[in-house]
């Protein structure tokens, strides 16, 4: 829901965050119509991130709802290699690596039953991305 955009911007401007992200795993979030497979896949991916990066500083790597400060835009975006589904994860991991402050806000999330995400190929690309980032951490 785009009305939450103001909450993201407020996290940056009023709470001194460098990046604010929506999190479906925030305790105050509401998630609707999520299939068991999508929930499992999402939780497994986030668990894998925590295994590879024990200190990530965020719970939900791919909500896809974020706002960044001018500082991140200027100093970090050019370091991100991925321009597909792994972009969000890479943005968060590099933000943590370089000491930027990450804030998560709750969201109201309704799953799209008509999603065109190819789970297997996306998962393979994401795992490769995680390994690439880990090797350069």
Give the positions of each predicted feature.
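Short, surface-exposed, polar/charged, turn-prone segments marking secondary-structure boundaries
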Residues: 46-50, 94-95, 130-135
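Acceptor/aglycone-binding surface of glycosyltransferases and processive sugar-polymer synthases
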Residues: 2-83, 112-121
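Residue-level signature of catalytic and energy-coupling elements of molecular machines
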Residues: 20, 69, 95, 105, ...
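C-terminal catalytic/acceptor-binding lobe
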Residues: 98-137
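Alpha-helical elements of Rossmann-like donor-binding domains used by nucleotide-donor carbohydrate transfer enzymes
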Residues: 7, 47, 90, 126-129
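Catalytic donor-sugar/metal-binding loop of nucleotide-sugar-dependent glycosyltransferases
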Residues: 56-57, 79-83, 92-110
